[in-house]
Curated annotation (Swiss-Prot):
It is an enzyme of class 2 (transferase). Its EC number is 2.4.1.18. The gene is glgB. This is 1,4-alpha-glucan branching enzyme GlgB. The active site is at D408, E461. One of its GO terms (biological process) is glycogen biosynthetic process. SUPFAM superfamilies: (Trans)glycosidases (SSF51445), E set domains (SSF81296), Glycosyl hydrolase domain (SSF51011). It comes from Actinobacillus pleuropneumoniae serotype 7 (strain AP76).
Length: 777
């Protein structure tokens, strides 16, 4: 084709393509019919020549460059409804063969578009984002993104010199999705979406559904395959059940341990090799990871994510993370992920004003802006936003084997007036303060995970008294499996901060939690939030001198492990780190090496033994959420600050927990018990092994048939100072009890016989009575 006559369509598309605002490139570029012939149009701004090749490499036509902007047109001698062709493109320094993206049809099915628009696609991450695939025998990447209000969206990356003119995408008006298949793009390629918004502004955005991201401060998404599904271990998921022991070790991967020589992070492999054996040895059943979805600012600890589907690149690749989780499972340890779906940061490469409109967030800052955190609130009422967030729960459980999600800042999600003054928030449609859309999102997501999650659990960090957090949605609940008990944590830590002499006046701070214990399924949390921002460490919250602080801490942990509810402890607290947590440094492991570890080693040993005892005795966990599993034995001894309660298992076995929160030894302290048997002190926080003063009961404790505290039997104890002791009861064997009962019955019969009067005795008594009566007359 030597000459070319421009049409109005040509002139229009030359302007659209060269000025980079073409919304429908597939209607013009690629193979099209033109009367009795076919034409192929190619737009390559930097090219000097373009030839059309057949599948076997034969030149079918040489394209004519009809505009300096880079538009080439090739005419074929016959009509083709479809054609497997390639491009041979000449540049100033070389000539290379390329596939034409505009010859490939969309792989988005009508059903996908419909489900995505409706917000009911269970797994939109299988469609949206960047997916390695083969189309018509050609390998490449299928890109798709939701941006309904954009004028134009292009894929840009290191494969097209980040030039938004080269690969504009196809728009699906019915769903607002843009897509394109780019041949020969490979795993590891960097990319973003260049978006022209309705105001003519260019926005360079990371992929919301990216499966990998660049290491900060760079912000490009990285092409990688959708992770394969993980086969669920039913036994491990059973370990999430309410009648199982759950002891959670909360970890920030960036500061648990670091390389001493340069203060740099361990990678996922190094973490797996060190963290998992440690957690296993310490007796924890679960690891909870602070957020590991990609985030730009280290100081956010991961709580301001920009890539919910992308594991942070700080510690390695997504496959490395999957290996870490697999190794935890092999060790019998479940993994929980801190899940942040309440807000997102304002970083320009993220979700904020994604297509120029308030797409993921609310437009009105009274609904869409978090004043406390300078973040934006998701618009849960928008179908596509709901779908984006809800399916993320399945992504982590199915593709990484995550066993549970801990949902961050639930209170900020469900209340429209959270941390706002009057006039700073908008009521819901009924005039109330509840965020009905957020509640609907949580209910539907929890219901979906119950159905699809194969036993994965969802835990709420919810700090108010909102009713029904762990109740079923069918009962007007929200459907979480567990809820953090922030009230118990705050009350008990306040109590422990008091000098023992004043604790008697605040006795109820340790007992009040039982008033609402069975309203929800609670986790007792001593989390990262309690050891930052000037709150000091958990050890630092304890009252007294150094010895008393450690004794108080051991006693407090004992009370916590004995109390109903699952356990959570933030890293460093297991060995009583003295300073606040610093996300930018390793924990103070050196404390365990100084002078043999001293008091810190004592606390470490105590926590290890608490965990092991907790798992050994079903009484300490089986009936956490059943009133039949707990009974106060001593609840009102405020003058001596002593507490005692009994934990019971389904089979009736029990463990008694006794705490003394004064530095005074309580000798000969009698506690009523419900059954006779052998009582044994199985744990004592004051033992020398834990660096205590070694006061205790030294083995078996005699049970006596002396009534006390309304019980038929009792035991007499020596309760160490600032301590918690655990006492296991082994009831007398049934045969022994029956034998004793038989002996008692025989004795009673013998006694009755001994006291029963004979006939002779009756006769004598009668005569004496008659004589006395006669004399009286």
């Amino acid at each position: 084709m030597k000459t070319y006559t421009y049409s109005k369509q040509d002139l229009s598309f030359i302007e659209q393509l060269s000025q980079a605002y073409c919304k429908d490139p597939f209607s013009y570029l690629g193979l099209h019919q033109a009367g009795d012939v076919s034409v192929i149009r190619v737009f390559l701004p930097e090219a000097t020549t373009v030839k059309i090749l057949s599948a076997d490499g034969q030149i079918l036509s040489e394209a004519l460059k009809i505009d300096d902007s880079g538009l080439f047109v090739a005419q074929l001698s016959q009509q083709y409804s479809s054609l497997n062709y390639r491009l041979r493109v000449g540049y100033s320094l070389a000539e290379i063969d390329l596939e034409d993206p505009y010859r490939f049809t969309s792989s988005l099915l009508p059903m996908d578009n419909w489900l995505l628009a409706e917000g009911t696609h269970l797994r939109p991450y299988e469609i949206l984002g960047a997916h390695l695939k083969t189309q018509e025998g050609v390998s490449g990447v299928h890109f798709s993104v939701w941006a309904p209000n954009a004028r134009r969206v292009s894929v840009v990356g290191d494969f097209n010199y980040w030039d938004g003119r080269v690969n504009p995408m196809r728009f699906h008006a019915e769903s607002g999705i843009w897509d394109i298949f780019l041949p020969n793009v490979e795993k590891g390629a960097l990319y973003k979406f260049e978006i022209l918004d309705s105001n003519g502004n260019i926005r360079l955005k990371s992929d919301p559904y990216a499966f990998a991201s660049q290491f900060r401060p760079d912000t490009a998404s990285v092409v990688t395959g959708l992770p394969e599904k993980i086969e669920v271990d039913a036994k491990l998921r059973h370990a999430n059940d309410p009648d199982q022991p759950i002891s959670i070790y909360e970890v920030h991967l960036g500061s648990w341990r670091r390389h001493l020589e340069n203060n740099y992070w361990l990678n996922y492999e190094e973490i797996a090799n060190e963290l998992i054996p440690y957690v296993k040895d310490m007796g924890f059943t679960h690891i909870e990871l602070l957020p590991i979805t990609e985030y730009p600012f280290d100081g956010s600890w991961g709580y301001q994510p920009t890539g919910l589907y992308s594991p942070t690149s700080r510690f390695g690749s997504p496959d490395d993370l999957r290996t870490l989780i697999r190794k935890a499972h092999e060790a019998g340890i479940n993994v929980i992920l801190d899940w942040v779906v309440g807000h997102f940061p304002t970083d320009s490469h993220g979700l904020t004003e994604f297509d120029g409109s308030h797409l993921y967030e609310h437009q009105d800052p009274r609904e869409g802006y978090h004043q406390d955190w300078n973040t934006l609130i998701f618009n849960y009422g928008r179908h596509e936003v709901f779908n984006y967030l809800s399916s993320n729960a399945l992504y982590w459980t199915e593709r990484f084997g995550i066993d549970g999600l801990r949902v961050d800042a639930v209170s900020s999600m469900i209340y429209r007036d959270y941390s706002r003054k009057d006039g700073e928030w908008i009521p819901n449609q009924y005039g109330g303060r509840e965020n009905l859309e957020a509640l609907d999102f949580l209910r539907r997501t929890n219901r979906m995970l119950k159905k699809e999650g194969h036993g994965a659990v969802v835990i709420a960090e919810e700090s108010t008294s909102f009713a029904g957090i762990t109740h079923s949605p069918t009962e007007n609940g929200v459907g979480f499996d567990y809820k953090w008990n922030m009230g118990w944590m705050n009350d008990t830590l306040r109590y422990m901060s008091l000098d023992p002499i004043y604790r008697q006046y605040h006795h109820d701070w340790m007992t009040f939690g039982m008033m609402y214990q069975y309203s929800e399924k609670f986790v007792l949390p001593l989390s990262h939030d309690e050891v930052v921002h000037g709150k000091c460490s958990i050890l630092g919250k304890m009252s007294g001198d150094c010895w008393q602080k450690f004794a108080n801490l051991r006693a407090y942990y004992g009370y916590m492990w004995g109390y109903p509810g699952k356990k959570l402890l933030f890293m460093g607290n297991e060995f009583a780190q003295g300073r606040e947590w610093n996300y930018n440094e390793s924990l103070d492991w050196f404390l365990l090496g100084e002078q043999g570890g001293g008091w810190h080693k004592g606390v470490l040993n105590w926590v290890r033994d608490l965990n092991r005892t907790y798992q050994k005795y079903p009484a300490l966990y089986q009936l956490d959420y059943d009133p039949a599993g707990f009974e106060w034995l001593v609840v009102d001894d405020w003058q001596q600050s002593v507490f005692a309660f009994e934990r019971k298992a389904k089979n009736g076995e029990s463990v008694i927990v006794v705490s003394n929160f004064t530095p005074v030894v309580r000798h000969n302290y009698r506690i009523g018990v419900r059954q006779d048997g052998t009582y044994t002190e199985i744990l004592n926080s004051d033992a020398a092994y834990y660096e205590g003063s070694n006061v205790g009961n030294y083995g078996e404790i005699e049970c006596e048939a002396i009534e006390s505290h309304g019980k038929p039997f009792s035991i007499e104890l020596s309760i160490p100072p600032l301590s918690t002791i655990f006492i296991a009861c082994q009831p007398k064997p049934k045969e022994a009890v029956e034998a004793e009962q038989d002996i008692v019955k025989m004795a009673e019969v013998a006694m009755q016989k001994a006291l029963k009067p004979t006939k002779k005795t009756v006769s004598v008594k009668a005569k004496a009575h008659k004589k006395a009566h006669k004399n009286k007359k």
